[in-house]
């Protein structure tokens, strides 16, 4: 059996670029002009607490990178270690490109992965990505690296190979196939079957898990990292208590899918809803169409034209409507 380490290059590049710089802030008082450096905003706020308001200061983020060769070395070391941990004979590296189809989904409130442009990116991220490209990384346009990792896992199962998705992204927990999260796992893990979900041990009002139930949970709960939350389409709230209330005792795919459908029906009791999307456009969708939209957010494409069909799935498992 051929074993391949399928690497999420986006994560490797980001982590190594971030590790190769020191971050701090400079706070300047708007009236006096006096400036002071702090390691982070928490330290700054602690010093001015009870003395000044944060609004009295201009705060600037400062990023100080080390020599780029250290970041390159970090990426080489990481990828070599991934290959060895997976006991792979070769490795593949994928990087995100342009035109992710999910960016165009008419989600309410906020665009898919919205607000990420406001995040501070490592100074050397572009150079690290370019280095991986020159090392043979493949650019994925039209969808995400997560989709490509899911595709390679599916192709491995189809062809009798062991393609191991090397990523720390939680979305992979809902994809059938081999996965290796080098920050949490001592060795690759096979994700298969219905699986299970449980409260996230570090993040409040979030969950963790694996298998198809993890996907079903994302389908109805959403993903705070990717900025989609199905209950927002109806202006409702839905947390982990509600999530476990509908999925905890489900033992089969049919029970899970029925529970997900029933929750969407509670949000959209008339069967149709009209809402305003993040870009200001107005849309009218049926329950199934809304479920299709959110499934598109959570479902990783196993091939380029792999489209999730809610209607067909509901009919296949015999969901009562």
Segment roles from a protein language model:
Residues 33, 320-321:
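Short amphipathic alpha-helical patches
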Residues 1-2, 288:
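Extreme N-terminus of proteins, especially the signal/transit-peptide cleavage junction
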Residues 88, 111-320:
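Extended two-metal-dependent nuclease catalytic cores across DNA- and RNA-processing enzymes
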Residues 2-162, 166, 177-186, 190-192:
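Noncatalytic, basic helical substrate-engagement surface that gates or grips nucleic-acid strands
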């Amino acid at each position: 059996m051929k074993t391949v380490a399928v690497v999420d290059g986006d994560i490797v590049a980001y982590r190594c670029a971030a590790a190769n710089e020191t971050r701090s802030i400079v706070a300047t008082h708007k009236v006096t002009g006096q400036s002071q450096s702090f390691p982070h905003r928490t330290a700054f706020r602690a010093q001015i607490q009870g003395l000044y308001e944060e609004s009295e200061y201009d705060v600037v983020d400062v990023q100080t990178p080390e020599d780029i060769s250290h970041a390159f070395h970090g990426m080489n070391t990481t990828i070599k270690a991934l290959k060895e941990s997976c006991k792979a004979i070769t490795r593949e590296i994928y990087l995100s490109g342009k035109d992710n189809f999910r960016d165009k989904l008419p989600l309410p409130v906020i665009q898919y992965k919205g607000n990420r442009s406001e995040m501070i990116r490592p100074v050397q991220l572009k150079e690290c990505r370019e280095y991986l490209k020159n090392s043979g990384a493949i650019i994925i346009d039209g969808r995400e690296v997560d989709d490509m990792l899911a595709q390679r896992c599916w192709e491995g199962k189809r062809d009798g190979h062991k393609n191991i998705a090397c990523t720390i992204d939680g979305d992979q927990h809902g994809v059938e196939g081999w996965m290796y999260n080098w920050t949490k796992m001592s060795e690759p893990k096979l994700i298969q079957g219905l699986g299970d979900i449980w409260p996230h041990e570090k993040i409040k009002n979030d969950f963790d898990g694996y298998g198809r139930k993890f996907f079903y949970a994302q389908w109805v709960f959403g993903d705070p990292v990717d900025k989609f939350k199905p209950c927002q389409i109806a202006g409702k709230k839905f947390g982990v208590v509600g999530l476990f209330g509908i999925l905890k005792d489900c033992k089969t795919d049919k029970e899970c899918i029925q529970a997900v459908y029933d929750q969407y029906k509670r949000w959209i009791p008339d069967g149709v809803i009209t809402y305003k999307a993040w870009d200001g456009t107005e849309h009218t969708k049926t329950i199934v169409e809304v479920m299709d939209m959110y499934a598109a957010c959570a479902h990783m494409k196993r091939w380029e034209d792999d489209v999730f069909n809610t209607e067909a799935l509901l009919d296949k498992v015999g969901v009562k409507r």
